Amino acid sequence: MNVLVINAGSSSLKYQLLNPATGALLAKGLCERIGIDGKFTYKPQLEGKEAIKAADVAMPTHNEAIAAVLNALVDEKNGVIGSMKEIDAVGHRVVHGGEKFAKSVVITDEVMAAIEECNPLAPLHNPANIIGIKACQQLMPGVPMVAVFDTAFHQTMPPVAYTYAIPYEYYENDKVRRYGFHGTSHKYVASRAADMLGKPIESLKLISCHLGNGSSVTAVDGGKSVETSMGFTPLAGLPMGTRAGDIDAGILEYLMNKYGYSIGEMLNILNKKSGVLALSDGVSSDFRDLEEGAEKGNERCALAREKFAYEVKKLIGAYAAVMGGVDAIIFTAGVGENDALERMRIASGLEYMGVKMDEDANNVRGEERVISATDSKVKVLLIPTNEELMIAMDTASLVG
């Protein structure tokens, strides 16, 4: 079975063609600058097939982008499948499912209407996701489509975790609550952790640290999300590449009054000009640049790295308390998978809860392995995330 995985943005579209049963990747690529001057990238994973890198392809809409993807996949010379009939289903990443979706679903007219009702909760993402779905429906009639939601995994959180301490009417009338994000990633690595530990996921207490330009930590108890650091939006929680994370709301009023910022300007600062970029005094939002700066004696770069590790460590301690213990801590995503120094910073000081790192095992990038010492009571795991494979697996389970 082959599943085409689509992640549609407002002017871009990422795609992968996978076999969810074996995990085999047949092809992947990217459509960029849709609606502007289209750039198309195609990377077949079969031997002897030639890639296409940032080629000029007219893509006035997402329909042309999807058409370019399909044409490349079935191309007589460099395609990876013989015909469109070999695409059994399409899995779509959808950012926000609100409270309507606690799991992935086959897309119907009713599902599309419900996704559109969630647009106000993710105005930058959901409308683009919907455009991608509609383009595929037009070009691939009869092929089953599945929506996989970033928020769905966290719908198992109890009210004590998701309810904000503001007038309850805002939850009842406006659905203001903690939703959490990166759910597909947290779900995937939690499943892999159970496999690595050789234990049923129902018996495990896991803390998943998805650390990248966007970062979140999730407590997974018995395979279910019970707490997570992102909130109503992906702006909450940890300081990230350019996002502030948790901040005293009174600061916003203070700065808006003092400098005359509009709400839009204030949100732009919090989303685009904060996080480790701000902590490093504008040096970079990239942790590699921050480490280089810190090594050269830049105290602000050092502060940015230390602050990030400090906040992750706080969440690990808090989530262990929420679950009454922890069996394993997982590091994943760009920073989590590739930054051995930051992993050590985070783990340092967690010895009291039974964490004991193996420095040699930790000195690796992007390789699935145990990075704690053999006698560590709490295991520490490095697990590269694979959201596309998780989407393909969910899709196959629903339509297979």
Can you say where each PLM-predicted feature lies in the sequence?
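Extreme N-terminal starter segment of soluble prokaryotic enzymes
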Residues: M1-L4
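Internal helix-turn-beta structural module
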Residues: A302, E306-V322, V326-D327, G336-G400
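Glycine-rich phosphate-binding loop of actin/hexokinase-like ATP-binding domains
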Residues: F153-N257
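A mobile "lid/hinge" subdomain adjacent to the ATP/sugar-phosphate binding pocket shared
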Residues: Y259-A304
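Short glycine-rich, Thr/Ser-proximal phosphate-binding strand/loop in the N-terminal lobe
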Residues: S12-M59
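Short beta-strand-loop/turn "lid" adjacent to the catalytic site in phosphate-handling enzymes
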Residues: L73-H125, A152-A161
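Short glycine-rich phosphate-binding loop at a beta-alpha junction
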Residues: G82-V95, P144-V146, G324-G334
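Catalytic phosphate/nucleotide-handling subdomain of diverse soluble enzymes
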Residues: D221, V226-S262, N268, A333-V364
